[in-house]
Amino acid sequence: MFKKFTREDVHSRSKVKSSIQRTLKAKLVKQYPKIEDVIDELIPKKSQIELIKCEDKIQLYSVDGEVLFFQKFDELIPSLKLVHKFPEAYPTVQVDRGAIKFVLSGANIMCPGLTSAGADLPPAPGYEKGTIVVINAENKENALAIGELMMGTEEIKSVNKGHSIELIHHLGDPLWNFSVE
């Protein structure tokens, strides 16, 4: 999603009203229930959320100059900077060491990268197709990427072929390096 994202893709910037800010907080908590305990730390009551409208109907939301989440259609997706602050709040999968270089170059994740030794998928029933997941790597402390499941985790285990996660955002991509100022 952010492979060719540049400053020229930004169309407008505006401050978000406090009523919309409350709605965004509620939506984040609904999508990621584990974030409820830290939502006020994440978006302090006195802080101002800035909405940055971009090309392809992408909306970035920044707090204090840092993009914390973004939206393509309806679902709010955390940025990796937010994930690194609160890693336990999101659905997570783990790829094996062999997949790291491909993930960091922006490639979609294949099923074998999630089912081999060193990889980790959640126990049954797992996650459904379309779930936004944080992608960790074997023996690495911080998340590598964020993606959307192209099939459920149980199907990934049984099929073990083809693309399983469409990458949305990864370390080193233009969103990771994007500066609001």
Swiss-Prot record:
Protein location: Cytoplasm
Domain of life per record: Eukaryota
GO molecular function: RNA binding
Matching SMART domains: PUA
Main location: cytoplasm
Residues the record lists as N-acetylmethionine modifications: 1
Coiled-coil spans in chain: none
Signal peptide feature range: none
Family matches, as InterPro entries: MCT-1/Tma20, Pre-PUA, PUA, PUA-like_sf, Uncharacterised_CHP00451
Domain annotation PUA: ranges: 90-172
Family note: Belongs to the TMA20 family.
Note: Present with 4220 molecules/cell in log phase SD medium.
UniProt xrefs under PANTHER family: MALIGNANT T-CELL-AMPLIFIED SEQUENCE 1 (PTHR22798:SF0), MCT-1 PROTEIN (PTHR22798)
Subunit structure: Interacts with TMA22. Associates with ribosomal complexes.
Protein name: Translation machinery-associated protein 20
